[in-house]
Structures are given as structure tokens and as C-alpha cells.
Amino acid sequence: MSINDPIGDLITRIRNAQMRRKDKTSTPGSRLRASLLDVLRDEGYIRGYTTTDHGNGRTEFEIELKYFDGQPVIREITRVSKPGRRVYASVKALPRVANGLGIAVLSTPQGVMADHDARDKNVGGEVLCTVF
């Protein structure tokens, strides 16, 4: 099966699994997805993920979702830059999510990072998604 928007697919899998109160969900692996999952793990939105190699160059990530008092830690996760409409932001124009309580995940020349890291490194890029 061909996936046209791998980041949108990852976000949808996480959102659907948390709505159903699943402990884990799986997704096909890629370097961009791994970078995005690293940011979500470092910011405390997921417990972590494990990589399974199926051979033939195919990998799969099993994502361990995080809950607090029975409620998902991720209240809202939305895709910003889509295949049909890319959204880029300079350092001065980086979005603030929920007045600083959430994060925007960016793909920059220095790698995938949260908005506050991009401000610290004075770099802009493509706004992949917002998490609150």
C-alpha cells in the first residue's frame, strides 16, 4: 500500500490509538518518522518506541502511548504542512501553540526539532505538526 503523507499517517495512527485508549500502536518506519517520534518522546508526549526490522529494508515502529489519570497526554495533534500546501516559518514567525503550553514540530536544516529548540538555535523550517 502506498502512503502519500507518511507524517499525516503517523499522526492519525497516534490520534486513533489514543481515542481507543490503546497502550501501543505500530507504524511503518522511516528516518523522518523516527525523528518526529524522538521529539515527541523527548518532550514527554509518548513513552517511547521500539524498532522492528522485518528484512527487505522494511522496519516498523511500535509506539508506546502515554496517559495521565486515564486521559491521553496528547490532547490535540494536528498536521500543519501538508503535501498539497507546505507551510514554512522563519524564526520570528514560529507559531506558539496554546500560548507556549504545546509544541510545534519543525523540519529544519539542522534536523527535526521542537519550536523552542529552533528558537534557541535561531533556525526556521517547515512546520510539520502541532501538539498540545
Swiss-Prot record:
InterPro entries in the record: Ribosomal_uS8 (IPR000630), Ribosomal_uS8_CS (IPR047863), Ribosomal_uS8_sf (IPR035987)
Any one Gene Ontology cellular component term annotated for this protein: ribosome
Key words, A-Z: Ribonucleoprotein, Ribosomal protein, RNA-binding, rRNA-binding
GO BP term, example: translation
One of the Pfam families matching this protein, by short name: Ribosomal_S8
PROSITE patterns linked: RIBOSOMAL_S8 (PS00053)
Record carries keyword Ribosomal protein: yes
A GO molecular-function annotation: rRNA binding
Family named by the database record: Belongs to the universal ribosomal protein uS8 family.
Subunit: Part of the 30S ribosomal subunit. Contacts proteins S5 and S12.
Function statement: One of the primary rRNA binding proteins, it binds directly to 16S rRNA central domain where it helps coordinate assembly of the platform of the 30S subunit.
Entry protein name: Small ribosomal subunit protein uS8
The species this protein was found in: Azorhizobium caulinodans (strain ATCC 43989 / DSM 5975 / JCM 20966 / LMG 6465 / NBRC 14845 / NCIMB 13405 / ORS 571)
Native organism taxonomy: Bacteria, Pseudomonadati, Pseudomonadota, Alphaproteobacteria, Hyphomicrobiales
